[in-house]
Curated annotation (Swiss-Prot):
<keyword id="KW-1133">Transmembrane helix</keyword>
<dbReference type="GO" id="GO:0005886">
    <property type="term" value="C:plasma membrane"/>
</dbReference>
<keyword id="KW-0732">Signal</keyword>
<keyword id="KW-1003">Cell membrane</keyword>
<protein>
    <recommendedName>
        <fullName>Uncharacterized protein YwdE</fullName>
    </recommendedName>
</protein>
<feature type="transmembrane region" description="Helical">
    <location>
        <begin position="111"/>
        <end position="135"/>
    </location>
</feature>
<keyword id="KW-0472">Membrane</keyword>
<keyword id="KW-0812">Transmembrane</keyword>
<feature type="transmembrane region" description="Helical">
    <location>
        <begin position="45"/>
        <end position="66"/>
    </location>
</feature>
<feature type="signal peptide">
    <location>
        <begin position="1"/>
        <end position="29"/>
    </location>
</feature>
<feature type="transmembrane region" description="Helical">
    <location>
        <begin position="79"/>
        <end position="96"/>
    </location>
</feature>
<feature type="transmembrane region" description="Helical">
    <location>
        <begin position="153"/>
        <end position="171"/>
    </location>
</feature>
Length: 177
């Protein structure tokens, strides 16, 4: 096992995380005129747009990061391990104070210093633990060796959406217990 591939995964995930946060802030700033113009629309419309921007920027930057690793002949498992470590560290920050997962997922109070509620951030990070390795593997095995084809891209995103629906269903089931 080469430490450079693991370190690349760790650093790449940090860079992707910062870039995605910057894109989210830009999306929020760009949507301000529309919020004032379309004031009568529910907040869900603007939230859905922000989440879509977040997911697209995350997927796009990971595409370039995985493509670089593929071209540098790194091993996929080592890159995934490095990115997994950073995700696990971020999730562990939520659990350090002794809160249960159910308490964290029920905390939709955004009165603190964060832009988004802690539950939303925790769920995004938890879903990324499952979705990110799948996305990286699909890119590595399906898209990068064969070139970028729309058919393959739709196949990858279809698989990810199916997994996401299952994760949301499992979360709702967990919260109802």
């Amino acid at each position: 096992m080469r430490i450079s591939s693991c370190l690349y995964g760790f650093v790449a995930h940090g860079a992707v995380f910062l870039f995605t946060g910057g894109c989210m802030l830009l999306a929020m700033a760009a949507s301000l005129p529309f919020v004032f113009l379309l004031d009568r629309l529910p907040d869900v419309v603007f939230t859905a747009g922000a989440i879509l921007t977040l997911l697209c920027s995350y997927a796009y930057v990971w595409f370039w990061a995985v493509r670089f690793a593929y071209n540098q002949k790194m091993r996929l498992f080592e890159v995934q391990l490095g990115s997994f470590v950073l995700l696990a560290l971020m999730i562990s920050l939520f659990l350090l104070d002794g809160s249960s997962m159910k308490d964290i997922m029920m905390n939709w109070d955004d009165a603190g210093c964060a832009f988004v509620p802690p539950a939303f951030t925790f769920l995004c990070l938890s879903y990324a633990l499952v979705l990110l390795p799948v996305y990286q593997s699909k890119l590595w095995r399906l898209i990068l060796p064969n070139g970028v084809r729309m058919k393959d891209i739709f196949h990858v995103f279809g698989d990810l959406m199916l997994i996401m629906v299952l994760l949301i269903g499992a979360t709702l089931l967990f919260l109802s217990l």
